Structure formats: structure tokens, C-alpha cells
Amino acid sequence: MTGDNMEKYIEETVISKPNYCVPATLEMVLKHHGVFSLTQDDIASQLQIIPNEEYVDPVMWGAQIRKDTINDFFFFFFIALHETYIPINHIIDEYMLAEKVISLLNENITIICGYNYSYLYGNHESTYRHVSIIVGISTDYSNVTLLDPGPKNAGYNTVRIDSLFDAIKAGKDGLWCIS
């Protein structure tokens, strides 16, 4: 543990282009693991990016990640990383989420979480989905630090773990664990 938080070090915040939160987050993960040759644009070209057009349901904006999408991406570029997905319905409550985050950070596993962005910040009507990297947890396990690719509110943000748990549930997502 370092200071008041257990933190995973990420070298650089990559600011997301609109609807590129997944590519920007993956660029940060790749840089953390020593892969500097791919940008969010390169990553986006390999993933299906759906623009925020009026005729498209906002739930469908951005990258549509399915089973093995990330592993297929790693395989295509000969990147020696592996993604294991933990759906939120496999985690009972925020206490179990805290235990899982601590365990994964202790194992030096990068944790990307998918969640309902608006829900996390109090708007329970919106369906805007987003991803960030969980980089730390407070010593009392009540707060987590997210590295958010933005573009809005990019950078390190501390949120309550119970709010994050609820936002992950609202987004029907989970933890993308990369090692």
C-alpha cells in the first residue's frame, strides 16, 4: 500500500475523442504494459465504433465490446496480454467489489470497469455507458480512484464504491481484467 491508497500506476492520461472511451482506455493500458505503437485511432479502426447520430440509440454509441473482442484485438496485434471479464452479476455487493478490486490490484492486474456514466454522477434517467480504469482504493475501502479517459472530466476521479457498483449494475457491465 502506498499512502492512503493502493494504487496502480498509469503513466499518462489519454484524452478520449468523442465515443472513443474504449480505444483511449486501451491505449493507456497498452502504454502501461510497454506497447507504445498503437493510438486510440489505431485501436478504434479495429473496433466497431458507432457515432452519436440522432437516429442511433445512445446505448449503442461507441465501441460495442462482445465476448473475446479485447482478446481478439490483442491476438491480431501480437500483444501478450489477456482479458478476463467478470460480469457485475457475479459480484453480490459493493463489499465484494472492494475485495475483488483489492485482490486484482495486488495481483498487478489492470482493471477496466464499464458502467453507466450518468448514473454514477446522479442522473438515473440516462443510459450513457462509459469505461475507466480503476487505479486505487482507499484504505477503508469506501472509495475508488478512477482514471477516466473523458473527454468530459478526464483524469483521476474519486468516487464512492457503492455508487460505482450501482453504476456498473445500471450499465449491465462488469470488470475487464487485463494481465
Place the predicted regions along the sequence by residue.
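Short coil/turn linker and secondary-structure boundary residues
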Residues: 1, 38, 92, 96, ...
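Noncatalytic regulatory segments and standalone regulatory/sensor domains
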Residues: 1, 106, 116, 121-128, ...
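Generic structural signal of hydrophobic/aromatic residues within well-ordered alpha-helices
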Residues: 43-44, 101, 164
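Alpha-helix boundary/capping residues
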Residues: 47-50, 108, 171
